[in-house]
Amino acid sequence: TSYLMKFEKRIFNSISKYLNPLDIAATPEHLQYLPEELEYDFLLIGYDRIGYGIFRMLEKAKKSFLVIDFNPDIIRRLAGKKIPCIYGDIGDEEILERLDLCKTEFVVSTVPDVDDNKRIIKKIKKENPKARIFVTASVIEEALELYKEGADYVILPHFLGGERVSSLIEAVDKDPKKADIAKLAHIHDLRSRAELEHEHPRDV
């Protein structure tokens, strides 16, 4: 569950300062595939579930992209197919620092951690203000927070299915103005839901 994942993450963060920095930063070669002079239009953070649908859409559209995921089995499989990928937790500052986002047009995070997504938004806004940013939240309150931080769209999996997310990303990629329209409509909808107490309970 998302609660357990956050609990495990807090434990790791609390002990990481006692670990050898080289152990944290090192990424075994079989847990990444990074061709030389790699440039990617899309950065996909999180491959499972919604991320898989987005991945399929990017492949079909023949977009250049990089996948980041915390599941070593997924990264081994992608690396074996020579699909650009990195193993790691996007909440790890070292992973964020490795990313060159200057030419990235679109960043999609399917990781429903509000703090991680705030850091992602902050980094992208600093390095590449023109990039479109889609992030994920578990509840309406966090979604509205992420909009305030500058997200172009916040995915709420309980309200929006994976296929619709992929279709929206594809539409925005073709016409960036559609992101602004979708964002304003979504914020209005979320505020209405919040007033009616349609908030989805947190996973436990």
Task: Please report, for each region that a protein language model flagged, where it lies by residue.
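Cytosolic regulatory regions of ion transport systems
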Residues: 1-204
